[in-house]
Amino acid sequence: MWVEENESMALPQALENYRKQYRKIKLFQDISSVLHWDSEVMMPEEGREYRSTQIAAVAELTHEWMTDPSFLELIQSAKLTTKELPESERSLWNRELEILMEEKEKADKLPSEFVAEFAKLTNLAHAEWAEAKKEKNFKLFSDRLEELVHLSKKQADYFGYTTEPYDALLDTYEKGAKADQIQILFSDLKKSLIPIVAKAPKFESPFKKPIPIANQTKFCNRLPSILGLTTKESRLDISNHPFSTSLGKGDKRITTRYSESDPLSSIFGVLHETGHSLYESGLSKMPNWPNPLTEYLSLGIHESQSRLWENQVGRSLPFWEFMYPILLNDFELSESELPFQELYKYINSTEKSKIRVEADQVTYNLHIILRFEIERDLINGKTKVKDLPEIWNTKMKESFGMTIENDAEGVLQDIHWSMGAFGYFPTYTLGNIFSAQFFKKFTEEYPDSHNKFASKGDFSDLLSWLRKNIHSKGKILTIENLVSEATGEPANAKYLISYLEEKVKEVSISK
């Protein structure tokens, strides 16, 4: 049981001292998030160099505070004090301090100058990646990527590993995950996905004319509040690559990008990022925020929240029964110009795509498997940066039967490597597995939810279920225990496969 502290429950001084220093570190980490958000959304181009220096300075400062011996003394003193607490409080405090010590031990392995260098390099790399993508020329980014790969390998060496360097990086996003285990999971998943892809129907776009950005913006601005993220605690902007970030309590930022020829891209981008922000919003509502227990559990769990709202909700019939008339109004279209059945079938169409973020939910995981294989070999030294375009294009031909025309639609399409985020990609598919299982359990407990979705656009039952079973748990439980407690069983990919098979069957019947 979680015991919330209040003014009448004064903390022992040792716990108060530890929390004060932790929250100082957290405060500056959030300041760094503000700098990052601004650099992607608002900052003029010529501010990049100095902004990189600012970000590096904050990263170095927070790292020095985290690794300072005096902070360790505060943690150790706090741990001794917990022995005097009642059992109901002691177990949570011990878990909190255990998590923090794991983070501190990891931070202790990285020199401060390395942290500053990595932070500055990734901020500079993003601008060069964006320019290279715009020019469709990998060579404009390859030298910087070479530096990022070098530093990422160095980071893996600092962290240490048993089997391969990639494991050390994977662990930073999904604690305890191992590349060889992921490989087995992905191989089995791929075998199940291939026959689904083969029988899945493809539908043509029902949009016969471009949809102005202003109309798309009007519709997209409605989505977060409909799902449960209020305008008082969030805002939606435009960026080169959709993302979401938490700048602190009551301040969640979402971005998307718009295309007049593909209005669904912005819509599903907003649904996805809103899912992330709803999770962060739920975490910040936990008692005694901020502390190590009120952080997100893993990126796999984080992605489960975004993919659930994007797919299980956003591609469902009840969701579009409610949103369809609103879409017509905002897009200034008639029913004859955009028939409901054509729209719904297209939303759930399966078609091999060159672009991951525009991929349907059936083939999406094949994109993740491709990226996992490439970045694993890259970090493990089996692949060279200069060969990435050729390797990428070959794998796309093998997996999708598609020819890549330029680097922008190939190796440069994703932002992740410019962030030094090697090991991130597998968490998307883990998130898909978790989300299907979570949603299945929710519908069992709330069998009438689809009616509330369709008739009222009421998603409060779902959000409440997620708040209770996922968001409010923070890092209190392990990943395995969270999934088991929420669904009654360990994580199982069968729910994702079943969901995809049922979805393909549904739209095939209506064909």
Where are these regions (language model features)?
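Divalent metal-coordination and catalytic microenvironments
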Residues: 18, 160, 272, 306, ...
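All-alpha helical catalytic cores of prenyl diphosphate-utilizing isoprenoid enzymes
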Residues: 186, 190, 213-217, 223, ...
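Contiguous, non-catalytic segments that form substrate-binding/exosite surfaces or channel walls
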Residues: 118-265, 462, 504
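A well-structured
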Residues: 2-175, 501-508
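Post-HExxH zinc-binding segment in Zn-dependent metallohydrolases
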Residues: 295-336
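Secondary-structure capping and boundary motifs in well-ordered enzyme cores
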Residues: 50, 114-117, 144-147, 212, ...
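C-terminal, non-catalytic "cap/extension" segments appended to globular domains
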Residues: 2-11, 30-33, 46, 50, ...
